[in-house]
């Protein structure tokens, strides 16, 4: 079992590493490529576009051909794209490399969640996804620090060589450690069960909405945090970095505590707690009389996301034993596109950073609480799920 957990964690971590590690080198990259920092900030959106594009096909291929045939090319593409970015001499080539990086990371991301669905029952999967969420929260803190240390001695290209090295590690794990987990092709008698795993299942769609809104909350916070903390609240850059590190610490602490909470409370209770924390955060930020109270509201956002997201993802994947790859892809596409669409629309309409965050917090909590209350699982979830591996 440990091999599957190690491989899944490694496959997922390419995604946040590809986002956060290069940011510290952005000024030098812009100078070397004769582009403005503003022009290169689109590299974030290009990377996410690559991930979304990969998810359109990766899940279906993973369900038909297996997890390894998607993970291995995905890791290889991430390596090649990282090297391509390091060799880019124009901003156009650099952005093309970032899109390819996103494609590779997207393939690996989809496979990671499919593997966890293949190998873990619902309760254990919820615990592991909560731990994974905590580890993912470490990357936005550690990656820029590692990038800064690298750039003290080496040029910005070394950041992408470091990412390539990470990709090589994932490729080696996928080649030599990961074993195929895709369930065996169903017999004719099992076809009705395969056909019953519909993406239009009300319970699955409700969890897609809940997780998409939750990701929209956390990405809205990350996207607006420089404006909120430095421009509106007046913190210095160093203080901003400290606050963001503390919020990551809150996320990690809650994420690592959630598996223990699942041993005491029902998953539904934790999901309700998550949305109540979002609602409390929105109200706190809306009526906040001081910076201290606002910072408390921000910690509620991080705690709310960490306590409920892994549980919701586990529930979303639960009904899909034969189509876990497609389900994972659908979740990823909805989360990436839905959150990006909200942030873009809010900016186009002219909603301020503060109101943008308060609005998504309150909308997410109300909609999600209604879905949790009124949309129950369509079938009982087995306490244990036997894995039928390919020979």
From Swiss-Prot:
InterPro entries: MFS, MFS_dom, MFS_Efflux_Transporters, MFS_trans_sf, Multidrug-R_MdtL. It is found in: Cell inner membrane. Keywords: Antibiotic resistance, Cell inner membrane, Cell membrane, Membrane, Transmembrane, Transmembrane helix, Transport. This is Multidrug resistance protein MdtL. Confers resistance to chloramphenicol. The chain crosses the membrane at residues 4-24, 42-62, 69-89, 93-113, 131-151, 158-178, 203-222, 245-265, 269-289, 293-313, 331-351, 356-376. One of its GO terms (molecular function) is transmembrane transporter activity. The keyword Transport applies. The keyword Membrane applies. It holds the Pfam family MFS_1. Gene3D superfamilies: Multidrug resistance protein D. NCBIfam families: PRK10473.1. Belongs to the major facilitator superfamily. DHA1 family. MdtL (TC 2.A.1.2.22) subfamily. It comes from Escherichia coli (strain SMS-3-5 / SECEC). GO terms for biological process: response to antibiotic. It is a multi-pass membrane protein.
């Amino acid at each position: 079992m440990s091999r599957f957990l190690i491989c899944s964690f490694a496959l997922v971590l390419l995604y946040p590493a590809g986002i956060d590690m290069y940011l510290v080198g952005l000024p030098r990259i812009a100078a070397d490529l004769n582009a403005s920092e503003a022009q290169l900030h689109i590299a974030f959106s290009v990377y996410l576009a690559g991930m979304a594009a990969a998810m359109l096909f990766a899940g279906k291929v993973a369900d038909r051909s297996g997890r390894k045939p998607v993970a291995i090319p995905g890791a290889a593409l991430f390596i090649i794209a990282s090297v391509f970015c390091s060799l880019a001499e124009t901003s156009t080539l650099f952005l093309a490399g970032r899109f390819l990086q996103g494609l590779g990371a997207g393939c690996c991301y989809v496979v990671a969640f499919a593997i966890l669905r293949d190998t873990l029952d619902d309760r254990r999967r919820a615990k592991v996804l909560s731990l994974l969420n905590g580890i993912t929260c470490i990357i936005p803190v550690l990656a820029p620090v590692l990038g800064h240390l690298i750039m003290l001695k080496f040029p910005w290209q070394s950041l992408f060589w470091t990412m390539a090295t990470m990709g090589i590690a994932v490729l080696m794990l996928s080649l030599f450690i990961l074993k195929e987990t895709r369930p065996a092709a169903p017999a004719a008698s099992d076809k009705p069960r395969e056909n019953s795993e519909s993406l239009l299942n009300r319970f699955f769609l409700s969890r897609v909405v809940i997780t998409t809104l939750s990701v929209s909350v956390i990405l809205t916070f990350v996207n607006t945090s420089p404006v909120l903390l430095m421009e509106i609240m007046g913190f210095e850059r160093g203080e901003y970095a400290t606050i963001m590190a503390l919020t990551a610490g809150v996320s990690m602490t809650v994420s690592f505590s959630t598996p223990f909470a699942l041993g005491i409370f029902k998953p539904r209770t934790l999901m309700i707690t998550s949305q109540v924390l979002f609602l409390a955060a929105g109200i706190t930020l809306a009526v906040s009389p001081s910076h201290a109270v606002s910072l408390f509201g921000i910690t509620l956002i991080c705690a709310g996301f960490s306590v409920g997201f892994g549980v919701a993802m586990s529930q979303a994947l639960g009904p899909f034993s034969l189509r876990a790859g497609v389900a994972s892809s659908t979740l990823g596409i909805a989360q990436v596109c839905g959150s990006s669409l909200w942030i873009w629309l809010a900016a186009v309409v002219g909603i301020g950073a503060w109101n943008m965050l308060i609005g998504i917090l309150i909308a997410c909590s109300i909609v999600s609480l209604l879905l949790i209350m009124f949309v129950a699982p369509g079938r009982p979830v087995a306490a244990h799920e036997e894995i039928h591996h390919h020979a």
